[in-house]
Amino acid sequence: MTIHTLKNGIRLLHIQENLPVAYCGFAVNAGTRDELENEDGLAHFLEHLLFKGTKKRKSLQIINRLEEIGGELDAYTTKEETFIYAVTPEKYVERAVELLADVMFNSTFPADEIAKERSVVEDEIQSYKDSPSELIFDDFEELVFENSALGHNILGKKKTLRKFNAKSLQNFIKRCYTTDNLLFFIQGNIDFEKVLKFAEKYFDVEKTERNFTRTAPQNYVPQSVEKSKKTFQIHCLIGNTAFSFGHKNRLAQALLNNIIGGSMLSSRLNIAVRERNGLVYSIDSSLNPYTDTGVWNIYFGCDKANFNKCNKLIYNELHKMREKPLTSAQLEKAKRQFAGQLLISAQNRENRLLAAAKSALHRNYCNTEEQTIEKLKAVSIENLYEISQEMFDIERLTVLKYI
């Protein structure tokens, strides 16, 4: 694994692996939280428009450039990053690199394409509103990160979307898509010298630097909010702020989250609420770290008649985590489970590469699964007990209910 910085500030992440396909793309240190007032949804809208025309290609030419050889082009936007990437048979990797560079550096944002894509995103917003189990996560972060751009919905609002034009998109690129904010990642049977030649050929752009800094959310105040929704179930999120992406205790907190409500059926919440009492179809907790803060929450949906029972069982499990430290045997079991999950998830090469690119983008390094597992060994009973005191503190929990 190699991380290298070009003269113009663009960084390269190279992972050589003997594969019949190649993965490559750009990670941009720009997302929803970098939008200014009245720019809600602009980062996501830009991601859509990057594929709608360049100085030498129309939209359909961009689509067909990789699909005609069986390749795929994809993208997504988060609160802090935008990813634009491709997978292609290894012998066509240069085709993918050239296309990605064209999209990144030469997009033109035709007015007719902006109008069409605005309609597409408006439909996406409406579809999202029809899915309470997804929408509630955005509404929850809006409460936790109140008065911060980090609380903004990624898709934005229809009223701001209708104001966006080519100038809006170009201004966002100029402000946020600076070369020091770009990382190009590539994985496959390609040596590093070849990657450098690709970069020299296709990434020959002027060096630019971001001239603003992000402001961390301040003064978290727990809230309890009910929203009226026409649903058969109550949907509920209970949660708290969490450690940032680079915090020394983030791995320990991730282990603690896995114990209380991770993806395994043996999590404490799943055992207590579903397996023993049959009150929900699913219940889980998730941890979402950002560069300067984070958010942790528990999600469940249940019949309205069962809500109080579910709530009592959940708070009981949180109380037990704060009152009684894990035993040595419980800790070793939790570490063994977590390590196994890491190794299995790493078999999804695309997700693994995207995670490595995110780490390299923000911290300029990325751990292997083996390195993470080695760090996991240092997590102690005392670490977890100390973290649980604040993480599961009832007085610090924000609660959002759709009823």
Regions found by a protein language model. Give the residues of each.
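Charge-rich, well-structured scaffold segments of protease-associated domains
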Residues: 5, 61-210, 243-244, 261-263, ...
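A glycine- and charged-residue-rich anion-binding loop/surface
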Residues: 10, 14, 32, 154, ...
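His/Glu-based metal-binding/catalytic segments typifying zinc-dependent metallopeptidases
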Residues: 16-20, 25-27, 209-267
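Short pre-active-site segment immediately N-terminal to the catalytic Zn-binding motif
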Residues: 28-39
